[in-house]
Design a protein with these regions (language model features):
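Short, conserved secondary-structure segments in the cores of folded domains
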Residues: 2, 57-58, 242, 263, ...
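Residue-level "contact hotspot" at macromolecular interaction interfaces
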Residues: 5, 60-63, 245, 266, ...
Protein backbone atom coordinates (compact mmCIF):
# COMPACT_ATOMS: atom_id res chain seq x y z
CA UNK A 1 0.00 0.00 0.00
CA UNK A 2 1.44 3.34 -1.07
CA UNK A 3 1.53 6.26 1.31
CA UNK A 4 -0.83 9.13 0.51
CA UNK A 5 0.61 11.88 -1.68
CA UNK A 6 1.02 15.25 0.02
CA UNK A 7 1.59 18.83 -1.02
CA UNK A 8 4.80 20.53 0.10
CA UNK A 9 3.92 22.47 3.25
CA UNK A 10 1.40 20.00 4.67
CA UNK A 11 1.64 17.98 7.89
CA UNK A 12 0.41 14.67 9.28
CA UNK A 13 -1.42 14.45 12.64
CA UNK A 14 0.07 11.79 14.92
CA UNK A 15 -1.83 10.42 17.90
CA UNK A 16 0.04 9.13 20.95
CA UNK A 17 -0.42 8.64 24.68
CA UNK A 18 1.67 9.78 27.63
CA UNK A 19 0.34 7.90 30.61
CA UNK A 20 -3.43 8.39 30.56
CA UNK A 21 -3.22 11.62 28.54
CA UNK A 22 -4.05 11.44 24.82
CA UNK A 23 -2.32 13.80 22.39
CA UNK A 24 -2.65 14.60 18.70
CA UNK A 25 0.11 16.74 17.24
CA UNK A 26 0.69 17.94 13.66
CA UNK A 27 4.20 17.24 12.39
CA UNK A 28 5.34 18.91 9.19
CA UNK A 29 6.36 16.67 6.31
CA UNK A 30 9.85 17.95 5.56
CA UNK A 31 10.78 16.35 2.25
CA UNK A 32 9.73 16.37 -1.37
CA UNK A 33 6.52 14.40 -2.08
CA UNK A 34 8.68 12.22 -4.32
CA UNK A 35 9.94 10.42 -1.22
CA UNK A 36 6.48 9.19 -0.26
CA UNK A 37 5.95 7.73 -3.73
CA UNK A 38 9.38 6.28 -4.51
CA UNK A 39 10.73 5.56 -1.05
CA UNK A 40 7.35 4.84 0.55
CA UNK A 41 8.16 6.90 3.64
CA UNK A 42 7.38 10.20 5.32
CA UNK A 43 9.96 12.42 6.95
CA UNK A 44 8.68 14.62 9.78
CA UNK A 45 10.36 17.42 11.70
CA UNK A 46 10.28 17.42 15.51
CA UNK A 47 12.04 20.07 17.56
CA UNK A 48 12.70 19.49 21.25
CA UNK A 49 11.39 22.47 23.17
CA UNK A 50 12.25 23.48 26.74
CA UNK A 51 9.47 22.85 29.26
CA UNK A 52 7.45 20.99 26.61
CA UNK A 53 6.13 17.64 27.83
CA UNK A 54 5.28 16.17 24.44
CA UNK A 55 8.56 16.81 22.62
CA UNK A 56 10.57 15.68 25.67
CA UNK A 57 8.59 12.44 25.77
CA UNK A 58 9.08 11.85 22.06
CA UNK A 59 12.85 12.31 22.22
CA UNK A 60 13.10 10.06 25.27
CA UNK A 61 10.77 7.28 24.14
CA UNK A 62 10.33 7.10 20.38
CA UNK A 63 12.80 4.87 18.56
CA UNK A 64 13.04 2.68 15.49
CA UNK A 65 10.09 0.30 15.51
CA UNK A 66 7.80 2.49 17.63
CA UNK A 67 4.24 2.11 16.33
CA UNK A 68 2.27 5.32 15.86
CA UNK A 69 -1.23 6.22 14.73
CA UNK A 70 -1.31 8.83 12.00
CA UNK A 71 -3.92 10.62 9.95
CA UNK A 72 -3.65 11.56 6.27
CA UNK A 73 -1.65 14.61 5.13
CA UNK A 74 -3.54 17.78 5.97
CA UNK A 75 -3.20 21.56 6.09
CA UNK A 76 -3.68 24.43 3.64
CA UNK A 77 -0.22 25.98 3.75
CA UNK A 78 0.86 25.07 0.22
CA UNK A 79 1.12 26.62 -3.22
CA UNK A 80 -2.20 26.74 -5.07
CA UNK A 81 -1.78 28.00 -8.68
CA UNK A 82 -5.40 29.18 -8.88
CA UNK A 83 -4.82 31.49 -5.93
CA UNK A 84 -1.10 32.20 -5.49
CA UNK A 85 1.48 33.94 -7.65
CA UNK A 86 4.40 31.88 -8.95
CA UNK A 87 6.79 34.28 -7.27
CA UNK A 88 6.63 33.59 -3.53
CA UNK A 89 8.37 35.33 -0.66
CA UNK A 90 8.52 33.05 2.37
CA UNK A 91 9.00 34.42 5.88
CA UNK A 92 10.00 32.11 8.71
CA UNK A 93 12.07 31.52 11.82
CA UNK A 94 13.48 28.45 13.55
CA UNK A 95 9.94 27.43 14.64
CA UNK A 96 8.43 27.35 11.15
CA UNK A 97 11.12 26.46 8.61
CA UNK A 98 10.06 22.86 7.92
CA UNK A 99 7.21 23.61 5.43
CA UNK A 100 9.57 25.79 3.40
CA UNK A 101 12.17 23.03 3.40
CA UNK A 102 9.60 20.70 1.82
CA UNK A 103 8.74 23.39 -0.75
CA UNK A 104 12.41 24.01 -1.55
CA UNK A 105 12.98 20.26 -2.01
CA UNK A 106 10.02 20.08 -4.40
CA UNK A 107 11.33 23.09 -6.34
CA UNK A 108 14.73 21.43 -6.67
CA UNK A 109 13.05 18.18 -7.80
CA UNK A 110 11.08 20.03 -10.46
CA UNK A 111 7.73 19.12 -8.87
CA UNK A 112 6.88 22.66 -7.81
CA UNK A 113 6.97 25.31 -10.52
CA UNK A 114 7.51 28.44 -8.42
CA UNK A 115 10.22 30.98 -7.65
CA UNK A 116 10.76 30.86 -3.88
CA UNK A 117 12.66 33.53 -1.95
CA UNK A 118 12.91 32.62 1.73
CA UNK A 119 13.55 35.29 4.39
CA UNK A 120 14.71 33.31 7.43
CA UNK A 121 15.06 35.23 10.69
CA UNK A 122 16.85 33.91 13.79
CA UNK A 123 18.80 35.21 16.75
CA UNK A 124 21.98 33.23 16.04
CA UNK A 125 23.35 30.94 13.35
CA UNK A 126 23.12 27.90 15.62
CA UNK A 127 19.35 28.47 15.85
CA UNK A 128 18.83 28.24 12.08
CA UNK A 129 17.35 24.80 11.49
CA UNK A 130 17.93 23.51 7.92
CA UNK A 131 20.40 26.32 7.13
CA UNK A 132 22.96 24.02 5.49
CA UNK A 133 20.22 22.14 3.65
CA UNK A 134 18.70 25.37 2.33
CA UNK A 135 22.08 26.53 1.04
CA UNK A 136 22.66 23.17 -0.67
CA UNK A 137 19.24 23.30 -2.35
CA UNK A 138 19.86 26.85 -3.59
CA UNK A 139 22.96 25.54 -5.36
CA UNK A 140 20.85 22.97 -7.22
CA UNK A 141 18.29 25.40 -8.62
CA UNK A 142 18.05 29.09 -9.41
CA UNK A 143 14.38 29.04 -8.44
CA UNK A 144 15.14 28.96 -4.71
CA UNK A 145 16.97 31.71 -2.85
CA UNK A 146 17.39 31.72 0.97
CA UNK A 147 18.15 34.96 2.82
CA UNK A 148 19.27 34.55 6.44
CA UNK A 149 18.70 37.35 8.94
CA UNK A 150 20.38 37.20 12.35
CA UNK A 151 19.54 39.65 15.12
CA UNK A 152 22.25 38.80 17.65
CA UNK A 153 25.36 38.21 15.57
CA UNK A 154 26.98 39.21 12.31
CA UNK A 155 27.42 36.38 9.80
CA UNK A 156 29.15 36.66 6.44
CA UNK A 157 26.76 36.89 3.46
CA UNK A 158 23.76 37.20 5.82
CA UNK A 159 21.62 40.14 6.88
CA UNK A 160 21.87 41.59 10.38
CA UNK A 161 18.85 42.81 12.32
CA UNK A 162 15.17 42.00 11.94
CA UNK A 163 12.68 41.28 9.15
CA UNK A 164 11.29 44.67 8.14
CA UNK A 165 9.37 46.21 5.25
CA UNK A 166 12.64 47.56 3.83
CA UNK A 167 14.25 44.12 3.97
CA UNK A 168 11.25 42.46 2.34
CA UNK A 169 11.18 45.02 -0.46
CA UNK A 170 14.93 44.57 -0.96
CA UNK A 171 14.54 40.90 -1.83
CA UNK A 172 10.98 40.78 -3.18
CA UNK A 173 10.75 40.07 -6.91
CA UNK A 174 9.51 42.66 -9.38
CA UNK A 175 5.82 42.49 -10.19
CA UNK A 176 3.20 40.54 -8.29
CA UNK A 177 4.16 38.00 -5.64
CA UNK A 178 2.61 36.06 -2.77
CA UNK A 179 3.83 36.13 0.82
CA UNK A 180 3.84 32.91 2.84
CA UNK A 181 4.58 33.30 6.56
CA UNK A 182 4.99 30.49 9.08
CA UNK A 183 6.68 30.46 12.46
CA UNK A 184 6.34 31.43 16.10
CA UNK A 185 3.68 33.76 17.46
CA UNK A 186 6.45 36.33 17.93
CA UNK A 187 7.26 36.21 14.22
CA UNK A 188 3.64 36.93 13.32
CA UNK A 189 3.47 39.80 15.78
CA UNK A 190 6.73 41.42 14.64
CA UNK A 191 6.27 41.08 10.90
CA UNK A 192 2.52 41.69 10.53
CA UNK A 193 2.85 45.52 10.57
CA UNK A 194 5.62 45.39 7.95
CA UNK A 195 3.62 43.10 5.67
CA UNK A 196 0.55 45.31 6.09
CA UNK A 197 2.63 48.36 5.13
CA UNK A 198 3.44 46.70 1.79
CA UNK A 199 -0.28 46.99 0.89
CA UNK A 200 -0.56 43.61 -0.78
CA UNK A 201 -3.94 42.22 -1.74
CA UNK A 202 -5.29 40.00 1.02
CA UNK A 203 -5.29 36.91 -1.19
CA UNK A 204 -1.54 37.24 -1.68
CA UNK A 205 -0.72 36.87 2.03
CA UNK A 206 -0.86 33.34 3.45
CA UNK A 207 -0.38 32.37 7.09
CA UNK A 208 0.59 28.90 8.24
CA UNK A 209 -0.80 27.35 11.40
CA UNK A 210 2.56 28.12 12.97
CA UNK A 211 3.43 27.82 16.64
CA UNK A 212 1.08 30.07 18.55
CA UNK A 213 2.55 28.84 21.81
CA UNK A 214 0.82 29.24 25.16
CA UNK A 215 0.98 33.01 25.43
CA UNK A 216 -2.55 33.84 24.25
CA UNK A 217 -3.32 35.25 27.71
CA UNK A 218 -1.16 38.21 26.72
CA UNK A 219 -3.12 38.94 23.55
CA UNK A 220 -5.40 41.94 23.24
CA UNK A 221 -8.86 41.21 24.53
CA UNK A 222 -8.01 38.57 27.12
CA UNK A 223 -10.01 39.46 30.25
CA UNK A 224 -7.61 40.41 33.03
CA UNK A 225 -9.95 39.20 35.76
CA UNK A 226 -9.73 35.64 34.42
CA UNK A 227 -5.96 35.27 34.75
CA UNK A 228 -4.87 32.41 37.00
CA UNK A 229 -8.33 30.93 37.41
CA UNK A 230 -9.29 27.26 37.19
CA UNK A 231 -12.72 26.27 35.92
CA UNK A 232 -14.74 23.08 36.09
CA UNK A 233 -15.88 22.19 32.57
CA UNK A 234 -18.74 19.85 31.82
CA UNK A 235 -18.21 17.85 28.63
CA UNK A 236 -20.82 15.76 26.84
CA UNK A 237 -19.36 13.24 24.38
CA UNK A 238 -20.87 10.04 23.02
CA UNK A 239 -23.80 10.44 25.44
CA UNK A 240 -21.40 10.52 28.40
CA UNK A 241 -21.16 13.50 30.76
CA UNK A 242 -17.74 14.26 32.20
CA UNK A 243 -16.38 17.04 34.41
CA UNK A 244 -12.78 18.19 34.19
CA UNK A 245 -10.64 21.12 35.36
CA UNK A 246 -9.45 23.69 32.84
CA UNK A 247 -7.05 26.54 33.53
CA UNK A 248 -7.64 29.99 32.07
CA UNK A 249 -4.18 29.92 30.46
CA UNK A 250 -4.77 26.73 28.47
CA UNK A 251 -7.00 25.69 25.62
CA UNK A 252 -10.01 23.44 26.06
CA UNK A 253 -8.14 20.92 23.93
CA UNK A 254 -5.29 20.80 26.45
CA UNK A 255 -7.75 20.05 29.25
CA UNK A 256 -9.44 17.33 27.19
CA UNK A 257 -6.12 15.73 26.26
CA UNK A 258 -4.99 15.65 29.88
CA UNK A 259 -8.08 13.62 30.76
CA UNK A 260 -7.53 11.24 27.83
CA UNK A 261 -10.58 12.46 25.91
CA UNK A 262 -10.29 12.20 22.12
CA UNK A 263 -11.40 15.57 20.71
CA UNK A 264 -10.78 14.57 17.08
CA UNK A 265 -7.98 17.16 16.91
CA UNK A 266 -5.72 17.55 13.92
CA UNK A 267 -3.96 20.89 13.37
CA UNK A 268 -3.76 22.01 17.03
CA UNK A 269 -4.16 25.65 15.96
CA UNK A 270 -7.85 26.13 15.17
CA UNK A 271 -7.31 26.04 11.41
CA UNK A 272 -8.89 22.78 10.25
CA UNK A 273 -12.00 22.84 12.45
CA UNK A 274 -12.01 19.08 13.03
CA UNK A 275 -12.17 19.63 16.82
CA UNK A 276 -15.51 21.45 16.54
CA UNK A 277 -17.67 21.50 19.67
CA UNK A 278 -20.87 23.30 20.63
CA UNK A 279 -20.68 25.71 23.54
CA UNK A 280 -23.90 25.12 25.50
CA UNK A 281 -23.19 27.50 28.36
CA UNK A 282 -20.45 29.82 29.56
CA UNK A 283 -17.81 31.95 27.86
CA UNK A 284 -14.56 31.27 26.03
CA UNK A 285 -11.80 33.57 24.82
CA UNK A 286 -11.10 33.32 21.09
CA UNK A 287 -8.39 35.69 19.82
CA UNK A 288 -9.74 37.46 16.75
CA UNK A 289 -6.44 37.14 14.95
CA UNK A 290 -6.63 33.33 15.22
CA UNK A 291 -10.39 32.84 14.81
CA UNK A 292 -10.84 30.74 11.68
CA UNK A 293 -14.37 29.52 12.27
CA UNK A 294 -16.92 29.60 9.50
CA UNK A 295 -19.74 32.14 9.76
CA UNK A 296 -22.24 29.32 10.18
CA UNK A 297 -20.22 27.89 13.08
CA UNK A 298 -20.11 31.27 14.81
CA UNK A 299 -23.85 31.76 14.33
CA UNK A 300 -24.63 28.38 15.92
CA UNK A 301 -22.27 28.66 18.89
CA UNK A 302 -19.63 26.30 17.55
CA UNK A 303 -16.10 26.66 18.93
CA UNK A 304 -12.83 24.98 18.01
CA UNK A 305 -11.35 23.43 21.13
Amino acid sequence: VKLAYFRPGQYIPIKFKIGSALFVRPFTLCASPTLSQTGDEYLIHIKKMPFDTESAYIFDNWEKGTRLSSGAPDGTFYYQPLRDEKNIVGITDDFGAAPFYAMACAVADGLLDIELTLIYGCRKKNDAVFMDEFIALSQKTEKFKPIFVFSDEKIDKCERGFITKALLEKYAPAGKFSVFINGSSGLYTRTAPHISAMRLEKKYVRFGSGDFGKDFVFLNGFPEKERGKIYLCKVIKDKKIMSLPCRSDETLLAALEREGIDANACCNSGECGKCRAKLLKGNVFIPKVYDRRRRADIAHGIIYT
